[in-house]
Amino acid sequence: MSDDRINYLKNKLVQYPDFPKKGILFEDIMPIFQDPRAFGILIDLLLEAVETEFNNIDVIVGLEARGFLFGPTLALRANCAFVPVRKPNKLPGDLVVVSYNKEYSTDSFAIQKGTIKPGQRVLIVDDILATGGTALAADELVTRLGGELVGHLFLLELTFLQGRKRLMAPTYTLLTGQDEAPDGSEFA
């Protein structure tokens, strides 16, 4: 993987201290999507990871909301289905719902029954790996539908939160950041 491409993406990230609450150092990935070159690099690097780290993916599951920014494009380029995992009351029909803890709150995820067939090989994608709570909730949804979880793919990992240690499936991240908890953080 080219250091120039990785550095280009890293230079697009913007940090916001004390957002969404005091003690959190928020990593804003949105500038990547405002730059067509950066977005193209992101998709190319994610596709390279899919092709080298994970085999024969049938479904890419994207987590609300920022997993939706690149999940469908990645699924299209990888020639597989895209399935959204959303907050409750955002999807119609029969759903499977699980609750989970995030680095600064509690939430729930839902997936439509029948969107993943038993035995399909599933890769979960999201923007940031923090505590691993959202990924674990998505793991449970995939498993309940009978999918075979092959791994997780993230744009950025906040290493000080050690979310990777909670995940059982192979995990790949393009970028790493925040090796230590921010000063004044509840995680310090």
From Swiss-Prot:
Pathway assigned in UniProt: Purine metabolism; AMP biosynthesis via salvage pathway; AMP from adenine: step 1/1
Class in the EC hierarchy, top level: transferase
Cofactor(s) needed by this chain: Mg(2+)
CDD domains named among the record's database cross-references: PRTases_typeI (cd06223)
Catalytically driven reaction(s): AMP + diphosphate = 5-phospho-alpha-D-ribose 1-diphosphate + adenine
UniProt KW keywords: Cytoplasm, Glycosyltransferase, Magnesium, Metal-binding, Nucleus, Purine salvage, Transferase
Binding sites annotated in the UniProt record for AMP: 130-134
Chain's role: Catalyzes a salvage reaction resulting in the formation of AMP, that is energically less costly than de novo synthesis.
Entry-linked HAMAP family: Aden_phosphoribosyltr
Subunit structure: Homodimer.
Record's protein name: Adenine phosphoribosyltransferase
Source species of the chain: Schizosaccharomyces pombe (strain 972 / ATCC 24843)
Gene that this sequence comes from: apt1
